[in-house]
A protein has these predicted regions:
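A structural signal for multi-pass alpha-helical bundles of membrane permease subunits
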Residues: 1-196
Length: 196
């Protein structure tokens, strides 16, 4: 592939991850907007539905929309981490495995996957922390309504709307606790040696 073309494709691939979360939420709101959203227009245009679906009006459909937005934002980072991990494995290892009669399935299971464990741990940990810290996308999609409320939004509203600083702080510490557990998981996997 052309090197310039590869750079452009890489830049386009990481765009969802590089954009601020609130901007991602606003862009997806145009897709899922109840009356004139792109998805409703598309589904009506091809005849799948007759009337617009209220994607942002129900807690369950809003949860699905928020999940789509977070996955869309997290996948590019995970892909970059996996690409870096795969490129860090010396090609001599694969050549030796092929000479020894290794099939693609066995090479992936016994060589690629074990050598990529630190990279996968980083990607999974980062993606999990991102999922815990979802706030901006929810505000962009549903405002401060109860439909999309999670513990971070509840903490924000408790602290700054109801001025209950103690309870809001305690809720934030709960989120911090879960993020620390994920961080410890990552650090334990990071310290494991990878033998080539």
């Amino acid at each position: 592939m052309n090197v310039k073309c590869a750079g452009v494709l890489l830049a386009m691939a990481i765009m969802p991850w590089a954009l601020p979360p609130f901007v991602n939420g606003v862009l997806w709101k145009f897709v899922f907007f109840s009356g004139y959203g792109f998805l409703n227009k598309l589904l009506i245009g091809i005849g799948i539905i007759d009337a617009p679906i209220q994607f942002l009006a129900s807690r369950w459909t809003l949860l699905i929309v928020i999940s789509v937005v977070v996955v869309w934002r997290s996948v590019p980072f995970m892909a970059l981490v996996c690409l870096a991990g795969r490129q860090s494995i010396p090609s001599e290892i694969y050549e030796a495995a092929k000479i020894d009669g290794g099939t693609g399935k066995h090479i992936f299971r016994y060589i690629t996957l074990p050598l990529m464990k630190p990279f996968l741990a980083l990607g999974i940990t980062s993606t999990s922390v991102t999922a815990i810290n979802v706030f901006d996308e929810i505000v962009a999609l549903s405002g401060y309504s109860d439909l999309g409320k999670n513990i971070l939004m509840d903490s924000y509203l408790t602290t700054f709307t109801f001025l209950n600083f103690g309870k809001g702080s305690a809720m934030t510490y709960i989120v911090l606790f879960f993020a620390m557990i994920l961080g410890i998981f990552y650090l334990r996997n990071l310290n494991k040696e990878v033998d080539y």
